[in-house]
């Protein structure tokens, strides 16, 4: 039996950062991970491969250059899965090496196999490939096992015609048509990628809209752009059956509509990977969809056991998981922290990108907080013309009482990079006046901040003149 100060189950973003943070504090650390999943879902089947796939799609289709060279422009006429996955596998390999090297450098013991609780302090790790069993104990334990795609009962997934977001990375050929069930972040990201590749995509969503946590104006802009790529939306519809035949699939909706397509991809949420952990032996149980409940310090109801990352639910982002892992380790060992910041940017890697930080107009209106809006259009930026992005936009929400920046919403090229400027200003309690006075490199997309800041200040100046 091996004894450690802390044992981390799962090597994704949350688990990795928890392990390294603990090691930096001088603690003995073990991390448990399944055989070929070092780096977790993030590196192997989630964030890294999907975002790399997106980059490959943008490059090979020439999507970003069509504004300049015409709608028919492509870097390669016939794009195959091999073209797309070559880049993906290369990046995954590099990321796995990075994770392994970081663990080795910080003297974190990597124990390969499936871990499950024997008692609240003891984990049995079974490596079925090597037929080995290892028992480890930890004064503290952090669960960071992540999630897997949820699969509705009654739907047969054959990994060829009917698949989920994991299986989509193993397609043998690019489908000419596809039904995407679910208009959440993952569904919309993949819908936009395949639409860019020329696949005829239909998105089916049982709610009346999509991405309802985002700014409505930004969502409408994204929907318009996706429709321009021939994406069809079926909102307020529910799938009742998926029939598979030699020619493809037929998706039947509750309304009676039938949609023929070569492939169906389900993006119906995520399921916590907790069913193999034997949590009852640790005095724990799960909530809906296999999630583990924690407090604001990421402690479970068993004080020495923490949980971080997707397995605890919203926001289920790699970036927030990393911070949760670090903070959980710090709390376990009595290291002072300020807690997790409320300013957490959201990034959606659709084509085009969407990103925001802070409040939305809906939230401010519900809270009766007076604000003004400043907007900058990419088509008015020299960088937008150079890059061929005439559709992008940046929106600032500014308090009319003290000029503080309340929210930043971006749609278009580099949105997920650009959002951090607004995040930094908000985090420092800065006002829109800082952006008015700031000097930005020219030509850049970052200039949009100054343009939007000037726009909102001009609106407020006009209002003040009207009051006189």
From Swiss-Prot:
Major localization listed first in the record, in broad terms: cytoplasm
Subcellular localization, as worded in the UniProt entry: Cytoplasm
Keyword Nucleotide-binding: no
GO biological process: 2-oxoglutarate metabolic process; NADP metabolic process; pyruvate metabolic process
GO molecular-function terms, A-Z: dihydrolipoyl dehydrogenase (NADH) activity; flavin adenine dinucleotide binding; NAD(P)+ transhydrogenase (Si-specific) activity
Cofactor note: Binds 1 FAD per subunit.
InterPro entries in the record: Class-I_Pyr_Nuc-Dis_Oxidored, FAD/NAD-bd_sf, FAD/NAD-binding_dom, FAD/NAD-linked_Rdtase_dimer_sf, Pyr_nuc-diS_OxRdtase, Pyr_nucl-diS_OxRdtase_dimer, STH_gammaproteobact
A cellular component annotation (GO) from this entry: peptidoglycan-based cell wall
Binding site for FAD: 33-42
Top-level division of the source organism's lineage: Bacteria
Catalyzed reaction equations: NAD(+) + NADPH = NADH + NADP(+)
Keywords recorded for this protein, A-Z: Cytoplasm, FAD, Flavoprotein, NAD, NADP, Oxidoreductase
Function noted in UniProt: Conversion of NADPH, generated by peripheral catabolic pathways, to NADH, which can enter the respiratory chain for energy generation.
Record-stated family: Belongs to the class-I pyridine nucleotide-disulfide oxidoreductase family.
PANTHER family linked to this entry: DISULFIDE OXIDOREDUCTASE, SOLUBLE PYRIDINE NUCLEOTIDE TRANSHYDROGENASE
Protein name as annotated: Probable soluble pyridine nucleotide transhydrogenase
